[in-house]
């Protein structure tokens, strides 16, 4: 889990711009199906952002 969370920051640009575009983080969740627990967690995070 920790590795997946930090994956979008290793894309080569600084952390702020990577998060602003949201490419790596959102792409990973779109590519693989979530377990029910992960889906619940993802919804909560979206609301907090």
UniProtKB/Swiss-Prot annotation:
InterPro entries (UniProt xref): SASP_SspO (IPR012613)
An example Gene Ontology biological process: asexual sporulation
Residue ranges of the region described as Disordered: 1-49
Any single GO CC term annotated in Swiss-Prot or TrEMBL for this entry: endospore-forming forespore
The protein's name in its UniProt record: Small, acid-soluble spore protein O
Location within or outside the cell: Spore core
Family designation: Belongs to the SspO family.
Induction of its expression: Expressed only in the forespore compartment of sporulating cells.
Encoding gene, per UniProt annotation: sspO
Keywords recorded for this protein, A-Z: Sporulation
């Amino acid at each position: 889990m920790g590795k997946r969370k930090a994956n979008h920051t290793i894309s080569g640009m600084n952390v702020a711009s990577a998060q602003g575009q949201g490419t790596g983080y959102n792409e990973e969740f779109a590519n693989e199906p979530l377990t029910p627990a992960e889906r619940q967690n993802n919804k909560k995070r979206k609301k907090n952002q």
